[in-house]
Structures are given as C-alpha cells and as structure tokens.
C-alpha cells in the first residue's frame, strides 16, 4: 500500500493538473493508481467538467473521487483564495473500493431497520467497510444520512467533508469515476486489507452567546432572535479583542446544537459548520448545513 500527494498553484487548469500528476507518478514510481482523490478550487469552476479527463491524460488514476473546495490542501501545503488543485493517489492491493452516489430525495425513512439502509447503500456489512463521504451542503441532508449509516454500520469508520467554493445550489462539483455531480453526495466504501483511523480536523472556540434561529430557508440563515445574522456579527465584532477581530475575518464558523433536549449546552455540544457566503442585501448568511427554525446556534 502506498499513498502520495501533490499540490499545484498554477493558474492554468491543464498546467496545474499536469504538474500535480507528474509529481504523483514520480512519487508512486508508476503511472498506475487504484484510487485518486482530487480537490479543485473555485477559480477553475468553468473547467470542473474537464478534470477527470485531464487527470486520465497523464496517468491511470483508478477510481477518481473528490470535490471542489474553497481551500485546497495537498502534500502538506494549503492554498486559500487562489487557484489550486491537489491530487492524492493510492496503490491499494487487497482493498475493494466501492463507489457510492446518492441524492437526499432518495434517503430511506429514519424509522426503518438497519437492513433497509444496507439494502439501499448496497454495501455488505459482512465486509466490515469503512466510508469516505463528500456532500454538497446546499442539497444534501448530511445529518440524516450519517445517522442512518451509523445505524446500519455501527462498527464502520465514517470520514469526509463538505464540498465548498460555491455560493448557491449547483455551483459545487462532486467527482466520482468519470462523472461530475452538482448536488447530492458521493462516497467510497473501503474494505479488505485496510484500516482507517479517524481524527477531528477542526476545533473552534465559541464567541458570543447561543442564539435561536427565528427564520431560515434551507441553508440560508435569515434571522437570529429577530435580528439579521450580519447585524449580530457586527455587534459581536465590537466586543472582540483585536486578535479575535482578525480571526473573525478569516476563520468564522457556526456551531449548531446537536442535541436540542439539552437544557444548558456547553462547548463540545455544537456541530461546527462552514459559512458559505453572505447576502448583504438581507443580512443573511449561507451555512454549510440545512437549517430549521428553533435551532440553537
């Protein structure tokens, strides 16, 4: 088993993929991989559909899997707010890689048995699979999906994240094989000679006080306790230290209460979600999760 990674900051899509792909083949010592994971910055959104074919032009990638991303990480480097592509490839002898793709409209009912979820995913629990999922936050109900997968595969590891870089539905890219999707979820189930360890990649320190959502529409947060979210942030900004004011500009996230039955939620009781954009006309915020009125954030 071998994993290698490369990142290119070239501003030309062909040149960026060629540079990253040549680094991959050099590190692998081969032009053949079993799995290739690709992340593409939104500066290349006009060329999202070219990515799988371009990768295949330079080496045999195996199954291509990935998505668009506002920040791109590869080979120990990170690129934000600039053109970038990262490619991670693996040679995985003895590992079964099963591609998965779903839309929220297809989800089984939450009250169904584990066997119904397993039949729907078409992944054998006896294979002891581990999962990697990438979802579009504007169209996919990730919490409901993960609750069902946890129910059906309690001993399996599940890792992944949200596609980003877009401000609205249809603007992100999800890659699976030679296909590109603009909504839903793509994933892979890994089984056989492989172990998966999980870590939490992101932790946050709370600022301000918990507030209740009083108006929202899908992923758009319109109102917090009667105020536009942007107004809440402006008021919060005035109370922060200079260091936190700088962090507010680049590292702001929203915490969503995980268990509404808790009387006094504390740090650690909130699910961290990305801010996807700002509607300055209404003062609303785009959030990387489907919201509902009454949630505490």
Regions found by a protein language model. Give the residues of each.
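Small-residue-enriched flexible segments
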Residues: 1-49, 54-57, 62-63, 67-72, ...
């Amino acid at each position: 088993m071998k994993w290698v990674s490369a990142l290119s900051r070239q501003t030309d899509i062909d040149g960026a993929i060629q540079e990253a792909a040549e680094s991959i083949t050099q590190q692998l010592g081969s032009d053949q991989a079993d799995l290739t994971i690709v992340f593409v910055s939104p500066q290349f959104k006009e060329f999202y559909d070219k990515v799988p074919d371009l990768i295949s032009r330079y080496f045999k990638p195996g199954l291509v899997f990935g998505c668009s991303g506002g920040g791109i990480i590869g080979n120990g480097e990170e690129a934000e707010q600039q053109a970038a592509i990262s490619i991670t490839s693996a040679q995985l002898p003895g590992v079964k890689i099963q591609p998965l793709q779903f839309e929220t409209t297809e989800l089984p009912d939450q009250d169904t048995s584990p066997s119904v979820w397993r039949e729907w995913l078409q992944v054998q629990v006896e294979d002891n699979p581990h999962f990697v999922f990438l979802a579009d936050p504007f169209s996919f109900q990730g919490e409901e999906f993960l609750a069902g997968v946890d129910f059906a595969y309690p001993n399996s590891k599940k890792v992944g994240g949200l596609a980003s870089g877009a401000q609205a539905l249809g603007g992100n890219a999800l890659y699976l094989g030679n296909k590109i999707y603009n909504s839903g979820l793509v994933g892979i189930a890994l089984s056989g000679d492989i172990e998966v360890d999980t870590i939490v990649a992101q932790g946050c320190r709370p600022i301000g006080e918990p507030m209740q959502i009083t108006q929202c529409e899908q992923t758009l947060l319109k109102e917090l306790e009667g105020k536009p979210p942007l107004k809440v942030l402006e008021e919060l900004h005035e109370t922060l230290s200079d260091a936190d004011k700088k962090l507010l500009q680049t590292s702001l996230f929203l915490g969503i209460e995980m268990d509404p039955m808790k009387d006094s939620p504390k740090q650690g009781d909130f699910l961290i979600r990305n801010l996807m954009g700002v509607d300055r006309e209404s003062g609303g915020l785009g959030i990387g999760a489907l919201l509902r009125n009454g949630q505490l954030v």
